[in-house]
């Protein structure tokens, strides 16, 4: 899980979602692509 000021999709399987007011990126193909805005 990377915590970044700016979250971006890294690959085509990444999805940007908003969970409890926090913007996150989840990825089914590569767990290293997980990000959280903060």
Curated annotation (Swiss-Prot):
Asked if the Swiss-Prot or TrEMBL record annotates the protein with the keyword Ribonucleoprotein, the reply is yes
Entry's Gene Ontology cellular component terms: cytoplasm; ribonucleoprotein complex; ribosome
| One Gene Ontology molecular-function label | structural constituent of ribosome
Arranged from A to Z, the UniProt key words for this protein are: Ribonucleoprotein, Ribosomal protein
Protein's GO biological process? translation
> What InterPro entries does UniProt report for this protein, alphabetically?
Ribosomal_bL36 (IPR000473), Ribosomal_bL36_sp (IPR035977)
What family, per the record? Belongs to the bacterial ribosomal protein bL36 family.
Q: What is this protein called?
A: Large ribosomal subunit protein bL36
| Gene symbol of the encoding locus | rpmJ
């Amino acid at each position: 899980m990377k915590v970044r000021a700016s979250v971006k999709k890294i690959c085509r399987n990444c999805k940007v979602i908003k969970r409890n007011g926090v913007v996150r990126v989840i990825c089914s193909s590569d767990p290293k692509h997980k990000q959280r805005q903060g």
